[in-house]
Curated annotation (Swiss-Prot):
This is Signal peptidase complex catalytic subunit SEC11. SUPFAM superfamilies: LexA/Signal peptidase. It is found in: Endoplasmic reticulum membrane. Disulfide bonds: none annotated. Belongs to the peptidase S26B family. Residues 163-174 are annotated as: C-terminal short (CTS) helix. The gene is SEC11. The C-terminal short (CTS) helix is essential for catalytic activity. It may be accommodated as a transmembrane helix in the thinned membrane environment of the complex, similarly to the signal peptide in the complex substrates. Glycans are attached at residue 115. InterPro entries: LexA/Signal_pep-like_sf (IPR036286), Pept_S26A_signal_pept_1_Ser-AS (IPR019756), Peptidase_S26 (IPR019533), Peptidase_S26B (IPR001733). It catalyses: Cleavage of hydrophobic, N-terminal signal or leader sequences from secreted and periplasmic proteins.
Length: 177
C-alpha cells in the first residue's frame, strides 16, 4: 500500500486527486450560492430556539430569490448580525417602514417558542434592527433532520476536525487506482 508513496508520479497524482475533490466541493458550494442567491445556501440550526419547527442539528436549504415579494411577519428567515459570522435562524416578529417614510424596511426577530424577548441582545452594539442586506435566506425550502449534528460535533470538539481530515488524507494517499 505504501509503495505508491515511493513513486513520485503516483504521489503527485494522488495529491492532485485530493485537490480535485476539494475544488469540486468548493465549486458545488459556490454554484449553489449563485442558484439560491444566498452566500450561505445551507445552514445548520445550532440551538433549540426554533423548536418544535426545527430541531437543533437540522440542516436547512435556503432560497433567497423571492424578488417580488417582501419579507412578512411570521416568516422564518436566516440572517447575519454585523461582526458575527454565524447565521441565525429565527422568525420575523415585527416589521417597520414602508419604503416611503422610512426609506428602508427594518425587522425584529425571535425564536419560535423558546424566547421570551426579541433578538436585539444578539445584534451588534448599536444595532437595533436588521435590514434586507442582513437577511441571507428568506425561504426555507427544505430541511434534513439531524444531518447537521456532524457540524455541531465538529465545532464543539475541535480535535474531531483533525481526526476527520487525517482519515480523509490517509484514504486519499492509500487508495489504489
Amino acid at each position: 500500500m505504501l509503495s505508491a508513496l515511493g513513486n513520485p508520479r503516483q504521489a503527485a497524482a494522488q495529491l492532485m486527486n485530493f485537490g480535485l475533490i476539494l475544488s469540486t466541493a468548493f465549486m458545488m458550494w459556490k454554484g449553489l450560492s449563485v442558484i439560491s442567491d444566498s452566500p450561505s445556501p445551507i445552514v445548520v440550526v445550532l440551538s433549540g430556539s426554533m423548536e418544535p419547527a426545527f430541531q437543533r442539528g437540522d440542516l436547512l436549504l435556503l432560497w433567497n430569490r423571492n424578488l417580488f415579494t417582501e419579507t412578512s411577519v411570521g416568516e422564518v428567515v436566516v440572517y447575519n448580525v454585523r461582526d458575527k459570522d454565524i447565521p441565525i435562524v429565527h422568525r420575523v416578529i415585527s416589521k417597520f417602514g414602508t419604503g416611503f417614510v422610512i426609506p428602508r424596511q427594518w425587522w425584529l426577530f425571535m425564536g419560535i417558542y423558546n424566547n421570551d424577548s426579541d433578538d436585539t441582545k444578539l445584534y451588534a452594539p448599536g444595532q437595533n434592527y436588521l435590514v434586507r442586506e442582513d437577511i441571507i435566506g428568506r425561504s426555507v425550502v427544505g430541511y434534513m433532520p439531524f444531518v447537521g449534528y456532524v457540524t455541531i460535533m465538529l465545532s464543539e470538539h475541535p480535535w474531531m476536525k483533525t481526526v476527520m481530515l487525517g482519515i480523509m488524507g490517509l484514504v486519499v494517499v492509500l487508495q489504489r487506482e
